[in-house]
Regions:
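Short amphipathic alpha-helical segments and helix-helix/interface helices
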Residues: 26-29, 59-63, 130-136, 218-221
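Alpha-helical scaffold elements lining the catalytic groove of polysaccharide deacetylases
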Residues: 80-106, 125-139, 147-199, 213-216
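Glycine-enriched alpha-helix->loop->beta-strand junction motifs that scaffold or abut catalytic
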Residues: 68-69, 137-142
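Residue-level recognition of beta-strand->loop/alpha-helix junctions
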Residues: 43, 76, 147, 235-236
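Short low-complexity, flexible loop/linker segments enriched in glycine and/or proline
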Residues: 55-58, 86-90, 158-162, 245-251
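Short, basic, helix/turn surface patches
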Residues: 66-74, 100-105, 167-185, 256-277
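C-terminal domain-boundary segment and adjacent tail
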Residues: 36, 145, 199, 209-290
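Active-site beta->alpha N-cap acidic-glycine motif
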Residues: 1-120, 205
Length: 290
């Protein structure tokens, strides 16, 4: 299993950026090292320019990832939805999103660059999708897929607000639901791979650099290990031939690559077991973000 983290350096979710960002980064990296798990973090360069000036304290968070032996990828500068952007505007945001990750990865000696679309929206028209695919390839990027997602950004908002309100009982309930959904999503991915490829494949998990993931990661990795997983780099996971299957999906949504590959292969997947965020969590999220 490859572990991927979006929206680096940190997803504040309404709380003060520091000291939560430092605490979360440290906790994530400690857990990853403890489990000997490589990971890649996808960076929003715009977070480093908060307030109209370069934030060295935020740069330092990325340096922690590099010092821990992790990889960094491009997640654009401003995390804008490709569905709402022109091809040219999105290309500009990709270019603006690459200076820091290119510098840090070059210093690390890495020649492979990865890109993940914000919200994994890869193009709602064939023209836009094909144009950005070609643009990324020309700039030396590989598009980062994911086969497991757990909507951790939704759980995180509710979790952070519960902690801020001192409601430890609610926070515990949210965290338990989050872990349960992640394991259920993993089981669905394990069932889906053989339906497409007649065998198991390396899974790729999409997470975010946020509080709930940091505080749940140790539990999650232990559960993955008990299911027989070992942790590999994204590059190693993508060496499996399944990942060479083209993504031909044109959509406003950003589903996992299993649904995209199914479209390419002409296979109708059974959605049974594909989990949804519990209704009570979604309602709390809507209240918090409305």
């Amino acid at each position: 299993m490859a572990l991927t983290f979006d929206d680096l350096p940190f997803v504040a979710a309404g709380q003060p950026y520091f000291p939560a960002a430092t605490r979360t980064t440290t906790e994530l990296l400690q857990v990853l090292r403890r489990h000997r798990a490589p990971a890649i973090g996808f960076v929003n360069e715009g977070q480093l320019d908060a307030g109209g000036e370069r934030r060295r304290d935020r740069d330092a968070l990325l340096q922690q990832w590099i010092a821990a032996g992790m990889t960094l990828g491009n997640h654009t500068y401003a995390h804008r939805d490709f569905n709402t952007q022109t091809i040219e505007a999105f290309q500009d945001d990709i270019i603006k999103g690459e200076p820091t990750i290119k510098r840090l990865m070059a210093a690390k000696g890495s020649k492979t660059l990865f890109f993940r679309h914000p919200m994994t929206h890869t193009g709602e028209t064939k023209e836009k999708k094909d144009a950005i695919d070609a643009f990324l390839s020309a700039r030396g990027y590989r598009i980062a897929p994911h086969t497991i997602e757990n909507s951790d950004f939704i759980f995180n908002v509710v979790y952070v607000r519960a902690l801020a309100a001192g409601d430890r009982a609610l926070a515990g309930r949210v965290r338990e639901a989050y872990v349960d959904m992640t394991i259920t999503a993993t089981a669905f991915a394990e069932k889906t791979a053989p339906a497409l490829f007649k065998r198991e494949i390396p899974q790729t998990l999409l997470l975010h650099a946020n509080v709930i993931t940091a505080e749940s990661l140790g539990d999650l990795l232990s559960r993955f290990e008990s299911r027989g997983y070992r942790f590999v780099t994204l590059e190693d996971a993508m060496a499996d031939p399944a990942y060479a299957t083209p993504d031909t999906m044109v959509s406003t949504s950003g589903p996992t690559w299993f649904w995209r590959w199914a479209r390419t292969l002409g296979v109708r997947l059974n959605p049974e077991g594909d989990p949804e965020v519990p209704a009570w969590v979604m309602e709390a999220y809507r209240r918090a973000t409305s």
